[in-house]
């Protein structure tokens, strides 16, 4: 980042060289506006943030405690508040990203209204949200820098030392952080994937996540009916994304290859194998088949293939989809991941049915036999009942070790019994909560997870917060519900949102008006503004 005084000097030289053309321009004001708009394009952002991610991956390889995190955000404002909070409480945005969830785009950002996570939303909603998020993050930069500029002006008026403030400006840490953006299954064929990836990169995405499901039959990873595609189809889309990065000059752009094979039991195609042991034959080896001992067993339009020297008929459903053998999910995941890493993916995503460190670690161990530096992005999904999952885990561990568990309901007999609020302060629940608190650290250390994300936290946070407010406001508390539960807490936490006019850009706008109009500027933040009360 260019130094403040150097940039002011550059604009002074520019003004001198242009004569009357820049006669009304104050070089220092121009320098300030330039600093407030550090990133001119989304591609600039993608280049900058991709370098950050690669550096973070290198740090993780040296020490797995250096894992990274993100929260899924469905609006630019939620992303802005997340990054501002990280910067406020952690004193840095280092190792903190934004996640863009296809589920939340479908559920909250489609012009069709709320949709399930089945790639039914308009594909342009994805790059539009990326652009919106970075617009809000850049606005957070502009606001914070503006307050530093005002402090600098005040120091000059008082005749105090301005060096410390200029140093803060020069060392300003941007709110622009990497985005991991969900492209679902690519929204069509490989050309469609390439075109959408370009739009996402142009909006600022440095990391694109793609899954190995059939695009037109895509399902949420935590629902039934998932259909995977042969490796050749999936790898062509990884290749398409890589070409999009290279075309736009983002050489360090990242691809997360997600496999849903652990929970997917169906495939749409039987790929063509050209020689024994190739990737198609290995994929087909997982098919559920029935040996044909006599050709009379085949009916009209049945399909039969030769497999390991035998004639077999792949088991096919009424809808024409083929089934995999039960119990093959683990091995299919391993093959998916190894193949993806060998074909251009930077990171892996294994969608699991529960948050279990050992289960994830067992798969990563197999992958690392071939690719020792393999790293995962992991979905700490709200689709998991975390409370129940970890209480059951502790219950089972205690049961196996012979510990007395007689005071707790057996999950096999009472599936949701351990969720009862009466167990919240029990020793079992305390132990489960410790495991939940340690989950990300343990998984990073033991299971190769470089990045932990929560897909839908701001969806649930909005739902809960609105319910709590509405319950009190429309109930007996009236206005106190808002004042006590929101405004008073904002004030005492010293949140920027308390002064919502300033956060929305009023202060920046007033300063710009003064740059443009001088003493004739009509300002919004002068006397009479209620924001002075905060």
What are these regions, as identified by a protein language model?
Residues 437-471, 477-513:
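Substrate-binding cleft of secreted/luminal carbohydrate-active enzymes
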């Amino acid at each position: 980042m260019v130094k403040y005084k150097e940039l002011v000097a550059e604009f002074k030289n520019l003004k001198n060289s242009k004569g009357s053309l820049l006669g009304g321009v104050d070089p220092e004001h121009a320098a300030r506006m330039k600093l407030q708009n550090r990133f001119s394009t989304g591609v600039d952002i993608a280049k900058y943030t991709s370098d950050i991610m690669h550096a973070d991956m290198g740090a993780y390889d040296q020490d797995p405690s250096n894992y990274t995190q993100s929260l899924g955000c469905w609006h630019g404002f939620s992303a802005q508040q997340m990054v501002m909070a990280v910067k406020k409480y952690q004193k840095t945005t280092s190792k903190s990203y934004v996640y863009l969830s296809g589920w939340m785009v479908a559920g909250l950002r489609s012009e069709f209204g709320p949709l399930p996570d089945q790639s039914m939303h308009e594909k342009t909603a994805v790059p539009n949200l990326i652009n919106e998020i970075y617009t809000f993050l850049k606005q957070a930069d502009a606001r914070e820098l503006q307050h530093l500029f005002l402090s600098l002006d005040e120091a000059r008026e008082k005749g105090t030392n301005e060096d410390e403030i200029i140093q803060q400006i020069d060392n300003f840490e941007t709110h622009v952080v990497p985005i991991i953006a969900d492209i679902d299954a690519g929204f069509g064929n490989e050309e469609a994937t390439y075109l959408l990836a370009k739009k996402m990169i142009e909006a600022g995405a440095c990391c694109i996540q793609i899954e190995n499901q059939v695009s037109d039959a895509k399902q949420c990873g935590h629902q039934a009916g998932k259909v995977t595609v042969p490796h050749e189809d999936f790898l062509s889309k990884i290749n398409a994304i890589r070409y999009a990065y290279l075309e736009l000059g983002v050489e360090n752009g990242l691809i997360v290859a997600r496999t849903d094979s652990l929970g997917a039991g169906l495939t749409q195609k039987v790929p063509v194998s050209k020689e024994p042991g190739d990737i198609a034959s290995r994929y087909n080896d997982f098919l559920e088949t029935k040996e044909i001992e006599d050709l009379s067993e085949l009916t009209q339009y049945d399909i039969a293939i030769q497999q390991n020297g035998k004639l077999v008929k792949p088991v096919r459903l009424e809808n024409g989809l083929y089934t995999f053998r039960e119990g093959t999910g683990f091995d299919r995941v391993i093959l998916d991941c190894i193949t993806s890493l060998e074909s251009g993916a930077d990171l892996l995503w294994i969608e699991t049915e529960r948050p279990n460190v050992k289960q994830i670690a067992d798969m990563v161990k197999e992958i690392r036999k071939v690719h020792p530096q393999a790293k995962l992005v992991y979905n700490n999904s709200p689709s998991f009942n975390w409370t129940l999952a970890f209480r059951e885990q502790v219950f089972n561990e205690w049961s196996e070790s012979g510990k007395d568990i007689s005071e707790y309901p057996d999950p096999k007999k009472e599936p949701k019994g351990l969720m009862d609020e009466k167990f919240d302060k029990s020793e079992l629940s305390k132990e489960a909560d410790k495991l939940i608190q340690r989950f990300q650290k343990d998984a990073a250390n033991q299971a190769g997870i470089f990045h932990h994300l929560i897909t839908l936290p701001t969806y649930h946070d909005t739902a809960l917060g609105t319910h709590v407010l509405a319950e009190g406001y429309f109930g007996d508390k009236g206005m106190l519900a808002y004042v006590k539960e929101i405004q008073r807490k904002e004030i005492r936490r010293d949140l920027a949102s308390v002064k919502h006019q300033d956060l929305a850009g009023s202060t920046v706008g007033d300063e710009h008006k003064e740059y443009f109009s001088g003493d004739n500027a009509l300002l919004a933040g002068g006397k009479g503004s209620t924001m002075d009360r905060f």
